[in-house]
Amino acid sequence: GLGARIRSQVSIPGVGRVDLIIGERLVIEADGREWHEGGSAFHADRIRDLALLRLGYVVIRVSYPLIMSEWMLVELTVRALIGRREHLWSATHRREGLAR
């Protein structure tokens, strides 16, 4: 395992549902062509990413081909973020009222 709690389809106020949250603040969004390919959907996804970043979340957006063909790269990235404890709220986040 990753050594961190994984939750799926988590609702974040002001953003909506995200695909996964690892730990407290690492968001993984999986983009399939069916829902995320059109120009307006692509734009809406980036608006969501910016909202998540303003709230203090770390966002990784991965495509279906990345998940299916390059999973090791995705996992290495997630493990690196966990190793740096970026999946957890810091004391600074808590002081600034970002921790949820």
Predicted regions and their residues:
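Surface segments flanking catalytic/ligand-binding clefts of nucleic-acid enzymes
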Residues: 1-100
